[in-house]
Amino acid sequence: MTLDNYFSELTDPEIVIKHSGLLQLSGLAGPEIIELLGLWSTIPTERRREIVDRMTELVEDNLDLDFASVFRACLRDKDDQVRAKAARGLEDSDDRTIIRPLIDLLLKDDSLEVRASAAVSLGKFAVMAQDGKVLKRDGERIRVALMEVIDRDDESLETRRRAIESVASFDSPQVEQIIKEAYDDGNPELKQSAIYAMGQSSDSAWMPIVIQETQSSDPAIRYEAATACGNLGEEDTVPHVIALLNDDDSLVQLASVRALGAIGGSLSKRALQQCLLMGDDAVEEAAKNALQEIEFDADPMGFSAES
C-alpha cells in the first residue's frame, strides 16, 4: 500500500487502525509530514487519540521506530489528550528541536496532563544537558522551566512531581534541597518521585536513604528504591536489591531485575542467573535482558565472542 493510500485510510473512521499500517508513519519527513498534517484535522478526535496512543505503544516495544515528526506535529493538536499522548511519546527522543515546544507546553498549556507529560519528556534532555550534549542555553532553559513549575503554588501535584524527577539530573544545591523537601513532604506520591530523583541525580550521597526504602512497607516505594539503586549504579546496593527479587509485588521484582542489570558485577550476575530458574516467565525474560546488558557493558565491542 502506498503512503497516500494509507493516509486516506487514516481519515476513514470505518477502517480499523492496525499496528502494521502505522509502521509507515515511522521516519516521516518533509513533504510526507506536510501531507499528513493537511489531513490530520479531518480525522475525528477519538481516532486521532487512538493513532497517537498506538504509536506510543509501538515505540515502547521497538526503539528503532521514529514517530518523532508526527508526535511533534501533534503537540499543536486542539485536543489536550492528543497533545499529552504526543508529548509522552517523545520521552525517549533526543531531537533537540522539540526542546522549546516542550518547554512551551510545560509553562503555558491549560491541561495539567499535557504539562505533566512535557515535564517527563524534558527529563531526557536534562540528562543530555548535564552530559554536555545540548547547548548550554538550552540546558539552562530546561532547568529554569522545570524549577518554575516546581515553585508554582497553584501547579498540580502530578506536574510538580514529574518536574522534580526531571530536574534531578541537574547538579546543584537548589536541586538537592528540592529532592529533600519532596522526600520529607509527607505526600506518598512526592516521596516516590523524590526517591526516583535520588537515583536520577547519580549522587551516591542519597544511597543510605535509597537502601533504607528498599524495606518500605509500600510496594510503590520499594519499586522506586529498586529503580534508584539501578540508576545510582553502586555495588553496595546489590544485596538489598537481591532481597527484592522475592518481593510479594511482581513489579518490584521486575524493577529489581532491571536494577541488577544496570549495576552489573559478579554478584548481580549470579543472582540474575538464579532468576532464570524461578519459573516466572516475566522475571526470566527480564533476567535474560539484564544479563545481556551486563555482558554488553563488560564487552561492548564483542571481542570475547570472537576469541
Q: What kind of feature is each model-predicted range?
A:
Residues 7-15, 41, 45-53, 117-128:
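HEAT-repeat alpha-solenoid elements in large eukaryotic scaffold proteins
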Residues 5-6, 14-22, 33:
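Eukaryotic low-complexity, mixed-charge intrinsically disordered interaction/regulatory segments enriched
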